[in-house]
Amino acid sequence: MIALLSPAKTLDLTKPNLDIETSKPIFISEAEVIMNNLKELEIQDLCPLMKISEDLGVQTFTKIQDWNTIYYGDEKPFVLSFKGEAYRGLDADDFTKEDLEFCNDSLRILSGLYGALKPLDGTKAYRLEMGTKISIDGSKNLYDFWGNKIMEAVLKDLENHKEKVIINLASNEYYKSIKKIEKKVRVITPVFKERKGIEYKVVTVYAKKARGQMVRYITKNRITKSEDIKNFDLDGYEFNERLSEGDTWVFTRD
């Protein structure tokens, strides 16, 4: 069983006091191709392409120009660097070395630049969303550039797991890059809803955090069987069998 999560736009590169070796992303060669294309762009090209302000464009331009493929094994792990809502829910800062190692086996972080990241892959500062409309070496967009590579990498990792199931906690933008995996293995998609009057509705900011909390729950409880995630109970959520349908598992809270 492997869970999928989207990356965050914000990165914190402050190094933690942690004695654990980081790894080089498996698609570093592909990332280099993408970055070489981005290095040719000026700030005035990046801003409309990435839909960012000029100030953020300057920061992004610097990150792109500084990016390289040199790894020393002591970089900050991506799972500790990402700082979006999902990663606030995951809250990996208090993970033990054993937690991080389990998480490294059971989670893959989808990425526009790196394809698929392991949590303990070393961080290089970047900004590139999967939905960015950029052509790389003749491809139509990043989905076209990545093709089946991300799916094949995750399937290969899944071979080492007893249960061949994907827990999809990624956003639609990122899951689209691996959606064909549904034809190969079972995919369970948890959905998190809040009570609003007499109904339950998805509230984006809470749903993002809950996705990270689900990864935390899987990690801390060493869950390897998908059925066990139905016991997820962090922050008042509980599995709602009535609202769930097929492999779309709904978790609600009042």
From Swiss-Prot:
Organism of this sequence: Clostridium perfringens (strain ATCC 13124 / DSM 756 / JCM 1290 / NCIMB 6125 / NCTC 8237 / Type A)
Sequence similarity: Belongs to the UPF0246 family.
GO CC list: cytosol
Any Pfam family: H2O2_YaaD
Biological process terms in GO annotation: response to hydroperoxide
Identification of the protein by name: UPF0246 protein CPF_2407
